[in-house]
Amino acid sequence: MANIKSAQKRIKVIAKKTARNRMIKSQLKTAIKRFEEAVEAGNLEEAKVKLTFVEKKLSQAAAKGTVHKSSASRKISRLAIRLNKAI
């Protein structure tokens, strides 16, 4: 444990941010997995709904800094391409 008060605070803040980032990334992975399952099952209407949800979550994660903006944009693009190929 750190001896300096500001360092102790930083440890607490980093722990909170790490927990939040881990939660957000887990939600993203789950949402993407559900989208991919819908596409593979051929359930295109459900896949479209899931894609909009994934886009929203990725945009929020990028806004919070959990995921880089370019990375989020690239993932959204690739998922949209995957849906369009399935159609």
UniProtKB/Swiss-Prot annotation:
Recorded hits in PANTHER family, A to Z, give:
30S RIBOSOMAL PROTEIN S20 (PTHR33398), SMALL RIBOSOMAL SUBUNIT PROTEIN BS20C (PTHR33398:SF1)
Give an example GO biological process. Answer: translation
Which SUPFAM superfamilies would you find in this protein's record? Ribosomal protein S20
Q: Read off the Pfam families from this record.
A: Ribosomal_S20p (PF01649)
Looking at the UniProt record for this protein, which Gene Ontology cellular component terms does it annotate, in alphabetical order? cytosol; small ribosomal subunit
Function field: Binds directly to 16S ribosomal RNA.
Q: Which InterPro entries match?
A: Ribosomal_bS20, Ribosomal_bS20_sf
GO MF annotation: an example = small ribosomal subunit rRNA binding
The family line of this record is: Belongs to the bacterial ribosomal protein bS20 family.
The record's keywords, sorted A to Z, are: Ribonucleoprotein, Ribosomal protein, RNA-binding, rRNA-binding
The identity of this protein, by name, is: Small ribosomal subunit protein bS20
- UniProt entry tagged with the keyword Ribosomal protein: yes
